[in-house]
Regions:
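A glycine-rich dinucleotide-binding beta-alpha-beta segment and adjacent secondary-structure elements
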Residues: 313-365
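N-terminal helix-loop segment corresponding to the beta1-alpha1 unit
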Residues: 1-192, 305, 371, 377-408
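Glycine-rich beta-alpha junction loops
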Residues: 39, 129-130, 203-208, 243, ...
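Flexible, small-/acidic-enriched active-site or ligand-binding loops
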Residues: 344-392
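Oxidoreductase and adenylate-handling cofactor-binding alpha/beta cores
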Residues: 149, 176-196, 213-219, 262-270
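Conserved Rossmann-fold dehydrogenase catalytic segment
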Residues: 131, 160-170, 191-207, 225-231, ...
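Active-site-adjacent elements of ketosynthase-type condensing enzymes
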Residues: 209-229
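Aromatic-enriched alpha-helical interface/lid elements that frame and gate functional surfaces
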Residues: 235-314, 318
Length: 408
């Protein structure tokens, strides 16, 4: 039995963060119905932004956040469309949304209203900036709330360089897991209290939490961003190899590993160096750049493969700074089902599975829900609507059935 089997999820959200949380719940066995407006989730056409195909036959940019769902199209500005949504919620265990609170209130779909009507419902919401403060109603995406306001851009950049250009949704996918975990906890607590709960995760908060080490240490004089030539520990740094690749070494016990690493790279002359072998003294003298220079020279003589083989052979953590094309070829990913290949008509395509593993579940089966509105009639029939009522709702523009994706 899957962990979320018999749990019913209704989703009203767009783009990546909240939809992916619902996808994760669906992978765990939940029956997930996604509500879209007549305009559809904008993510359906985001493939154009990523140089990917987007069609009714192949739309991985949309599917990556929407596998294993059924899709209904409701005009929530209409009486009938809103009625259908509320009937869905009446039978649901979880409501997942990324709609801003002020908009939910206009529709009567905010937490306070739904709590009164459906006290067992778990209300799960992705927010940009949280529930309080001057930005609580502001628009935002992961690149603004998470990467920028949350400090990721300003912390992870090499000091003096422009902020990095991240993959889209970098913060969204992390938030999705946090929300799914919160939902699971709320459902467990409901077995004890009989009541649902409100679960929120903001992109802004998630980023600040992810930067916890920087947040706690900056106040003690460990400022960010840093230069790679001025790191506190040169053995926790990135180095450029002779084949124009980057590798990362992570050896937090500098004093213990200094002699071992110097011997490893052929610098026996620096073993027990009074100037460089003690991390505290190196930092006090402002000489970390000297150790970085030594390592730069050593790594500059090695290819990426040679560097990794040398350090891993000495049981010292060292990894390639991989790019997506490297990840496709990583046997470790395939051995652990980190990657999965979805069989589209034109060929299989790779995507990342969610990292939470259940020994009883294994790798989930994935299916694409297909066209927008593809389950509208089926879902309405299950709610008790007659064929005539469904047709009338379609004619009124309150609901829509299956329709082809329009290209931009």
């Amino acid at each position: 039995m899957k962990p979320m089997e018999h749990i019913k999820v209704v989703e009203l959200s767009t783009y990546l963060a909240a939809p992916t949380a619902a996808r994760v719940l669906a992978e765990w066995g939940a029956d997930c119905i996604k509500i879209e407006s007549p305009q559809g989730d904008p993510a359906r056409t985001q493939g154009a932004v990523f140089n990917m195909p987007y069609s009714d036959e192949e739309n991985l940019a949309f599917d990556v956040a929407n596998f294993n769902k059924r899709f209904v199209t409701l005009n929530l500005k209409s009486e009938t469309g809103l009625e259908v949504a509320c009937k869905l919620l009446a039978g649901a265990d979880v409501f997942v949304t990324s709609v801003r609170t002020k908009s939910l209130k206009k529709m009567g779909l905010d937490y306070e209203t739904l709590k009164e009507r459906f006290p067992r419902l778990v209300f799960a919401q992705v927010l940009g900036y949280g529930e309080q403060g001057p930005e609580k109603d502001s628009a935002g995406f992961d690149v603004t709330c998470y990467m920028a306001r949350g400090g990721v851009f300003g912390t992870t950049v090499n000091r003096g360089d422009a902020p990095m250009i991240p993959t889209n949704g970098f913060g969204d996918f992390q938030v999705s897991l946090a929300l799914a975990g919160g939902v699971a906890s709320a459902l467990f607590n409901r077995t004890r209290t009989g009541l649902g709960d409100k679960v929120t995760v903001s992109l802004h908060h998630a980023a600040v939490f992810a930067l916890s080490t920087g947040i706690i240490s900056a106040q003690y004089g460990n400022p960010y961003p840093k230069s790679r030539r001025e790191v506190v520990n040169p053995f926790n740094n990135v180095y450029h190899t002779s084949d124009d690749k980057w590798v990362v070494i992570c050896c937090p016990e500098y004093d213990r590993d200094f002699n071992k690493i110097m011997r490893l790279i052929g610098r026996e002359d620096l073993v027990d160096s009074p100037e460089l072998s003690n991390c505290a003294q190196v930092n006090a003298r402002g000489k970390t750049w000297k150790v970085v220079d030594v390592l730069d020279e050593a790594f500059g003589r090695m290819t990426r493969r040679e560097a990794m083989s040398l350090f891993k052979g000495a049981d010292l953590p060292c990894e390639s700074a991989n790019e997506p094309l490297d990840i496709y070829e990583d046997e470790q990913c395939w051995a652990n089902d980190i990657l999965c290949r979805y069989p589209y008509p034109q060929g299989g395509r790779n995507f990342a599975t969610n990292p939470v593993r259940f020994s009883s579940l294994g790798t989930p089966d994935y299916f694409s829900g297909g066209k927008q509105g593809s389950a509208t009639e089926e879902v309405m029939a299950a709610l008790g609507y007659t064929r005539e009522q469904v047709d009338a709702a379609v004619a009124q523009g309150a609901v829509e059935g299956s329709k082809n994706l329009k290209r931009l």
